[in-house]
Amino acid sequence: MNTLKIAVIGLGYVGLPLARLFATKYPVIGFDINQGRIAELQSGTDSTLEVEDAVLQGVLRTNAQMETGLFCSHNLEDIKDCNYYVITVPTPVDKNNRPDLTPLYKSSETVGKVLKKGDIVIYESTVYPGATEEECIPVLEKVSGLKFNVDFFAGYSPERINPGDKEHTVEKILKVTSGSTPEIGQKVDALYKSVITAGTHLAPTIKVAEAAKVIENSQRDINIAFVNELAKIFNLMDIDTHAVLEAAGTKWNFLPFKPGLVGGHCIGVDPYYLAQRAQEFGYHPEIILAGRRLNDSMGSYVASEVIKLMLQADIKIKNANVLVLGITFKENCPDVRNTRAVDVIQQLESYSTQVTIYDPWANPAEVVHEYNLETTTTLPQGTYDAIILTVAHKEFLELDLKSLLKPNGILYDVKGILDPKEVHGRL
């Protein structure tokens, strides 16, 4: 393994922590087509906040010819000497919730241009079972002119990064590995085992590893959909859902999930990958898609609950001032991709309310680019007819929310983290 040189393709929330970890033992080239991202990383700063600046700076190198460490580049020339290529690009869905494999195709083309005999290409992106061998490998073969499992090989090791989580970092999460042949499976497993302290699980085939990843997220999506449905039912009965879940949770085998908005680039997306693949085989999934529909309905449900509470408090809805706390997809993380807080905001605006969005974690330029919404990173002055806590950022727990409300204002807690006696409604 001494001659090993790794290229990590895609330096986002998944790729950068992995590249940094590999760089503690191996020479690593981090490759990304975004030149701004490369400049930022080479200066020793990570805007995703997944890798602390000091930790990043500890492995950074100034050129591609180093012994161990990380060099970030957008130049194809810098990755041509690598013999392991790890692809960590996003796998989103389009506006019709169909899998969009464009980033995978493009990154496979990139690797195909520098692929040599004996190289191993490992995919980490979440896909449906069969995508690596049926969609990605043909691109590698076509561009490189090499033959799969003769000249070059493949592996699949699904990412399990939890953005914003400083406890379960990449090396502390057990890694599923796989290879295109039994021998390659062992090599891929050994590579990850050398840096992942939590250990590895070698799956028998690439398809098994792909399927394992996509059901991890689908299972979580379905479990959250169940408690979201319970929240709707118990709210009609005037029963506190969180109190019910707390009581039920005293049984040893009750699974603890909380109601909420399900967004981000994994849980709200991956079930569609599995569903489409199932449909290609002639099976129409019922529970998977029902869970997606229910979770996707929660933003408009929250908005309508807030409007109902405002009407009951004799608040005029048109031009009412509403403060939304948080637009990222989860707490203590700057990632705004596929955030469902946007559904709440858009629904509120459809009632002609004036919505102010405060999020100290979100990059305002990114929010404008993604959703055409104005946000602020500093707490705005003034008082509001309604405040909705949509994201549990630690900063929000320190706010005196009562002082931001008008005398008859409404406080709604989507996350269930505020004192229930202080709020007018919660999921």
List the model feature ranges, each with a label.
Residues 1-427:
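Structural/interface elements that position substrates and couple domains in central-metabolism enzymes
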